[in-house]
Amino acid sequence: MGQSLHALLRDVGLELPAGLADPQLTSITSDSRLVGEGSLFLGLPGERFDGGRFWRQALEAGAAAAVIGPSAAQELPPAADQPVLVLREPVARSIGELAASYWGHPCRRMALIGVTGTNGKTTTTHLIEHLAVRVGQPTALFGTLVNRWPGYSITATHTTSVADRLQAQLAEAASAGSQLAAMEVSSHALVQERVAGCRFAGAVFTNLTQDHLDYHGTMESYYEAKARLFTAPLLDGDGPSAVVNGDDPWGSRLAEQLGGRCWRSSLGDPQAELQMVDLEMTGQGVRGRLLSPAGSGAFCSPLLGRFNLMNLLQAVGVLLQRGLPLAPLLEAVGSFRGVPGRMERVVVNGAESAALPTVLVDYAHTPDGLENALAASRPFTDGRLVCVFGCGGDRDRGKRPQMAAIAARLADRVVVTSDNPRTEDPDQIIADVVAGMPSGTDLSVERDRATAIAEAIADASAADLVLIAGKGHEDYQILGTEKVHFDDREEAEQALRQRQ
């Protein structure tokens, strides 16, 4: 961007060490392997190791300077004449601000909307993108599945990228003409300051249910992480700029904290600013009326499930806060067909068949997500509801018996299998799940996920519905430390073909 080191440091309020040279910077990066002549190396502290420890390698590779944290400086103290700036804590926040400044503060050039919550982030951000584009506003999307903007698209590797890469992507999106951007913001990203340097014009809280307690420890800590998105300097301003799920107990708490700065969304509270009424569920989706401070109107959506109504309500609501017109937004709702791996129907040769069971693949991997997916599936079967699921290894063990109890309560038949066991013993994970099943559950256990899917579909009648939960869009399994190709949709389609 042609910025000098001194100008960059001054822009974010950092003190200049005496004698520090003022070169023109050619790039910034937190990856020492990407350093070139004139780069600024950002020594980003991480969970497993401190990237600041690589400052020497960065300088040897031609970096003009390096910024590191106190722990890296203590471990490998730089000499007084070396161009190394030691930051005060929180280091990651300063690095995010540096990245935003280097890339010209991209959030000042387009309106950034952040979506956080346990479930619903992906569908809600995709809805925001779809609706905004349909009403003529070029929009970028950052999330679990893909990062894209006008003229560019790439499969995402993380829900929220590290700060320097994120700011570079935001700058590219703004330069490509994006007027708005929808971003999934994970709790990990908020704790690790990956979105430092961002300024959000709007924010959405979808819900909070048990997940990631292996990382956060308690639900209170998990909530506090999510709530960071709704505080300055990330989200600021006097008027309504947030949409919060008022039907969620944690959302109700957040709404009370935010007061007039948020609109509450609800499917049952007549006092909420955003509501849906006169709902009619059909085999083709749902129709009803949306009520908002900007007016009301009828809508028709092909999305399945009550939980998707909340996603839709919140997406429309946050765009209304941005001043987009209600009528065109509601018209655009009907053309949104959903997100890959979210209540996605698997068919053979692109066509449904009355001779085959209905098969849905969903990313549900939390207790709340599984309950929502099963509840949404029930109206679409005249036969049995069969649930195939497992729980990930090296993750929150407390949700395993909870998911088991939900599956046993809402499904007619349950098949427990593997789901990214990672370095845990798959049989022990399955045992943890089965321990939560009440006696009398119609239960099968099959460690091999492909076999479990094939047998569940082979055993199902044409009137049954088979829900394959947990992986959704993912096209891999993590076995030990190895990632191997695996796609629930491919396995399900193959099993359906065997039925023809």
Curated annotation (Swiss-Prot):
It is found in: Cytoplasm. Meso-2,6-diaminopimelate binds at R395, D419, N420, P421, R422, G470, E474. One of its GO terms (biological process) is peptidoglycan biosynthetic process. The keyword Transcription regulation does not apply. InterPro entries: Mur-like_cat_sf, Mur_ligase_C, Mur_ligase_C_dom_sf, Mur_ligase_cen, Mur_ligase_N, MurE/MurF_N, UDP-N-AcMur-Glu-dNH2Pim_ligase. Its cofactor is Mg(2+). Belongs to the MurCDEF family. MurE subfamily. Catalyzes the addition of meso-diaminopimelic acid to the nucleotide precursor UDP-N-acetylmuramoyl-L-alanyl-D-glutamate (UMAG) in the biosynthesis of bacterial cell-wall peptidoglycan. PANTHER family: MUR LIGASE FAMILY MEMBER, UDP-N-ACETYLMURAMOYL-L-ALANYL-D-GLUTAMATE--2,6-DIAMINOPIMELATE LIGASE MURE HOMOLOG, CHLOROPLASTIC. This is UDP-N-acetylmuramoyl-L-alanyl-D-glutamate--2,6-diaminopimelate ligase. It comes from Parasynechococcus marenigrum (strain WH8102). The gene is murE.
